[in-house]
């Protein structure tokens, strides 16, 4: 292999190229970074190479001693990561340089084994399988964090099952609801995301297709020694066992369903967490002040305003939720891959996939802290219910009056009464009490119940109970 040209004088070294999250604080310092960084991808590709040799040894395609030597050498700390990365500029993918470096490392230990490195394989098999290994490791972490966030949200929903608050539609007070129901909605989203992550993680496939999807290089003339279908089954089953990945129906070099599935699940997960974040931001506004993020000394400080306590956690999560769907769109566009290997579409997946994984991983880790430490001000929620002087119960009053006045008449009466109350600065109850058509239609106790926002939350409590029951494991 021709050595790539040396970097020009003044080119940055590895330390200067460190991507530590300066412009992406949602994932900076979180565990997912270590699982998707360059060295993690390098190790995953080496793991794919080593697993392949072991699978080939198990099926008699190469000596067991060679597989052992290759596995022993397949360590990222024995490979010059920066050289592999820069060498990829000459080959359009990092596997060519990786194979050369791995072969050299094996040759130093066992010259005979070096002949079996990358036997029959192709760059895309190695990189795609490595990508699935990276994704599986990251998804396991993301799934664990989603489960922890869901536990915290379930506790919030249970604790505030009957805590009344204003439901808001199109940014305005609509009808009373409960904070428990809002938290249950968050719980449902996170639980659904966790389920999707788990199902996807367990079904991620390895890639094995050879140069153009026929696996010809893996078998050579071996097809003369037995049924090709049997040989294929043995190799695929062995590789599945060695990688822990699922066996695909066909080589998927240009059938990019696994990547599209990752894009969809990660976009949904980030969006689900983003819904929580934007709700917290809305409820934490100074004018609303119904919730607050966990109080940590020094967090949320402004560079200019000493009094500020900014909603940092929800801001970080929301930033990821706005990025991942856009990146996922780029990944799904790569479904349009020409021929048996794309010139550019496959290559366009790598960085967006890494970003989707680490942004979602950072958001999931941040969501655990947000959900577990969220401060809820039930008294403020109750006070905010009274901001419209009772008009927030207009729907429930209209429903109660419908059997007596008719649906249209009841709605028109409440519309006029609410308008009068708002413009005259009076309560809805006062205005309704002066209407002659309502004189004596309902007993006083019934009016008091109808005009109490805390008693107009519908079946919110039952809905919360249902969400919590779905979260709990079935009794055995």
From Swiss-Prot:
Fumarate 1 binds at residues 137, 140, 201. Gene3D superfamilies: Fumarase/aspartase (C-terminal domain), Fumarase/aspartase (Central domain), Fumarase/aspartase (N-terminal domain). It comes from the Bacteria. It comes from Streptomyces cremeus. This is Nitrosuccinate lyase. GO terms for molecular function: lyase activity. Pfam families: ADSL_C, Lyase_1. Changing residue 302 to A: Loss of activity. NCBIfam families: protocat_pcaB (TIGR02426).
């Amino acid at each position: 292999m021709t050595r790539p040209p040396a970097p020009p004088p003044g080119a940055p070294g590895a330390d200067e190229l460190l991507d530590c999250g300066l412009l992406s604080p949602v994932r900076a310092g979180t565990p997912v970074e270590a699982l998707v960084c360059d060295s993690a991808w390098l190790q995953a590709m080496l793991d794919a190479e080593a697993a392949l040799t072991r699978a080939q040894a198990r099926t008699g395609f190469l000596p067991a001693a060679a597989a052992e030597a290759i596995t022993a050498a397949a360590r990222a700390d024995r490979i010059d990561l920066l050289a592999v990365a820069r060498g990829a500029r000459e080959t359009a993918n990092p596997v060519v340089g990786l194979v050369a470096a791995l072969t050299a490392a094996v040759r130093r230990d066992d010259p005979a084994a070096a002949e079996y490195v990358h036997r029959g394989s192709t760059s895309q098999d190695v990189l795609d399988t490595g990508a699935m290994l990276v994704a599986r490791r990251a998804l396991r972490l993301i799934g664990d964090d989603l489960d922890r966030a869901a536990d915290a949200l379930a506790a919030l929903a249970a604790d505030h099952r009957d805590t009344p608050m204003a439901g808001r539609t199109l940014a305005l007070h609509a009808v009373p609801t409960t904070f428990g129901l809002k938290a249950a909605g968050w719980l449902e989203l996170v639980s659904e995301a966790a389920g999707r992550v788990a199902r996807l993680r367990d079904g991620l496939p390895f890639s094995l297709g050879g140069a153009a999807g026929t696996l010809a290089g893996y078998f050579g003339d071996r097809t003369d020694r037995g049924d090709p279908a049997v040989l294929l089954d043995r190799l695929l089953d062995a590789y599945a066992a060695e990688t822990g990945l699922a066996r695909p129906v066909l080589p998927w070099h240009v059938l990019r369903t696994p990547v599209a599935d990752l894009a969809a699940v990660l976009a949904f997960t980030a969006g689900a967490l983003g819904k929580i974040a934007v709700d917290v931001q809305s409820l934490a506004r100074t004018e609303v002040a119904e919730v607050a993020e966990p109080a940590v000394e020094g967090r949320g400080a402004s560079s200019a305003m000493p009094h500020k306590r900014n909603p940092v956690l929800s801001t970080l999560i929301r930033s990821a939720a706005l990025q991942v769907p856009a990146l996922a769109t780029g990944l799904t566009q790569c479904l349009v891959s020409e021929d048996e290997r794309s010139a550019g579409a496959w290559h366009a997946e790598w960085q967006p996939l890494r970003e989707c994984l680490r942004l979602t991983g950072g958001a999931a880790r941040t969501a655990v802290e947000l959900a577990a430490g969220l401060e809820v001000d039930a008294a403020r929620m109750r006070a905010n219910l009274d901001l419209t002087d009772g008009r927030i119960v207009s729907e429930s009053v209209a429903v109660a009056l419908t059997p007596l006045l008719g649906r249209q008449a009841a709605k028109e009466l409440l519309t006029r009464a609410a308008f009068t109350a708002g413009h005259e600065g009076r309560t809805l109850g006062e205005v309704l009490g002066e209407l002659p058509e309502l004189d004596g239609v309902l007993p006083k106790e019934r009016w008091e119940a109808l005009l109490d926002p805390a008693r107009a939350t519908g079946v919110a409590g039952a809905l919360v109970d249902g969400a919590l029951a779905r979260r709990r494991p079935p009794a055995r």
